[in-house]
Amino acid sequence: MKKKSLALVLATGMAVTTFGGTGSAFADSKNVLSTKKYNETVQSPEFISGDLTEATGKKAESVVFDYLNAAKGDYKLGEKSAQDSFKVKQVKKDAVTDSTVVRMQQVYEGVPVWGSTQVAHVSKDGSLKVLSGTVAPDLDKKEKLKNKNKIEGAKAIEIAQQDLGVTPKYEVEPKADLYVYQNGEETTYAYVVNLNFLDPSPGNYYYFIEADSGKVLNKFNTIDHVTNDDKSPVKQEAPKQDAKAVVKPVTGTNKVGTGKGVLGDTKSLNTTLSGSSYYLQDNTRGATIFTYDAKNRSTLPGTLWADADNVFNAAYDAAAVDAHYYAGKTYDYYKATFNRNSINDAGAPLKSTVHYGSNYNNAFWNGSQMVYGDGDGVTFTSLSGGIDVIGHELTHAVTENSSNLIYQNESGALNEAISDIFGTLVEFYDNRNPDWEIGEDIYTPGKAGDALRSMSDPTKYGDPDHYSKRYTGSSDNGGVHTNSGIINKQAYLLANGGTHYGVTVTGIGKDKLGAIYYRANTQYFTQSTTFSQARAGAVQAAADLYGANSAEVAAVKQSFSAVGVN
């Protein structure tokens, strides 16, 4: 059944040059490959690894800047120094390779370049091993960057609001930030305007308003939905408020209750007894888990879910039971598997709201919490009833706090695929009838065997399974839910093996699939990573974990080749 008609504006093609065997090893004999990947359009490196510099006693940031200054011609920095062209955003240690990871943002005369982020790995002996991320070239030659005439940010917000065509109630006050923006072959200054709202339908829009002319150059919605079929939630008259309704966290005693989920199965629930009520507030993990009731309205977060006897068996409770339980299981998967403490690896609370709107056929991550509709009973049942859906949406938050892949075009499709991969792995972790379908537990409840997407066979639901079959239009943010099928198929082949388009892949299992993609997403992917760059990052991640000459590295290469990504 065809679920959607989407398309993707794809980024430029890539050329890869691999040279000279294996570079010197990272710590603990984890190897770094010697690879150079060039962007064919701008002819500058976008992923380079190997023995890039000699060992020094310098700080990691200085090592990276020294290398970039020596390679100014390759990266087309012009007369600007590396120190003037990049701003260090984060410096962290990588336990796997005992290296230092430096994340950077490209800037031009102090103004950040949209989507141009880089990540570098410097070994403990002070040598640069990996530099990932596309650099915007020849900015000093761009005529529009010489134009200092700009409209005010407030005017840019006004233009974006006019283009939006509705007057929403904003969740966050609109703001406009100045960026250097690459608009096709033209580079200009643009205000990036963020409009975040829930009514009339959820939106977290980014508008790109040219700073001198006020022209709308681009716009897209970064609300991360599980499906692109986003119909506005129909609002009902607000239920009468309970005078005892609670929004803020409560203090009390940890308890264990029970409840029935959307599919009728019984689950144990970590709750908090405060006063005479039991709240869906789980204090037992490194991150507190909260579950709220929107009461069929579109106000967030709603009221903290409460019950009188710690038995959540009413039909209305089911969506909350699953949202609460599955959020905990998703936390457990990331903690047990990667020692990650919540979505930001720093114990951020996990907030979920159920009964959002009326008959709302979607679920989404809005940048700060999870939101689930009840479905209309035909297309969807309550969307919190799918553990892969919850794992999918919370993985968007993990990505937001690591690579921060832009939710448009190839980087957006990669973002979606990563969420499908880990949503599926969370389902396997909980061993709840696991499979390689997405949303099968909550999609078309009256039709057995149906799902939103299939990782084993994306074409089953109209999605491409090979790069040659990709969509090249602009709907759905450039087809983020459609072209994710290409990476989904690659991931399935990597885990399970098989022959696809004449390429045979030796499967390495789902656990190693997760390890490679988690490392690639947190260590090598950047905001604008394309499928081709993702291949390079995943190959290096496998080399870090299993060795440069390992079967796992070979399998990663095979799996990407099988879906036409080189």
From Swiss-Prot:
The active site is at residues 393, 481. Thermolabile. GO terms for biological process: proteolysis. InterPro entries: FTP_domain, PepSY, Peptidase_M4, Peptidase_M4/M1_CTD_sf, Peptidase_M4_C_domain, Peptidase_M4_domain, Zinc_Metalloprotease_M4. It is found in: Secreted. Ca(2+) 2 binds at residues 388, 427, 435, 437, 440. Its EC number is 3.4.24.28. Zn(2+) binds at residues 392, 396, 416. One of its GO terms (molecular function) is metal ion binding. It comes from the Bacteria. Its main location: secreted. Ca(2+) 4 binds at residues 443-444, 447, 450. Keywords: Calcium, Hydrolase, Metal-binding, Metalloprotease, Protease, Secreted, Signal, Zinc. Residues 28-249 form a propeptide. Its cofactor is Ca(2+); Zn(2+). The keyword Amino-acid biosynthesis does not apply. Gene3D superfamilies: 3.10.170.10, 3.10.450.40, 3.10.450.490, Neutral Protease Domain 2. Ca(2+) 3 binds at residues 427, 433, 435, 440. It catalyses: Similar, but not identical, to that of thermolysin. GO terms for cellular component: extracellular region. Binds 4 Ca(2+) ions per subunit. Ca(2+) 1 binds at residues 307, 309, 311. Belongs to the peptidase M4 family. Extracellular zinc metalloprotease. This is Bacillolysin. The gene is npr.
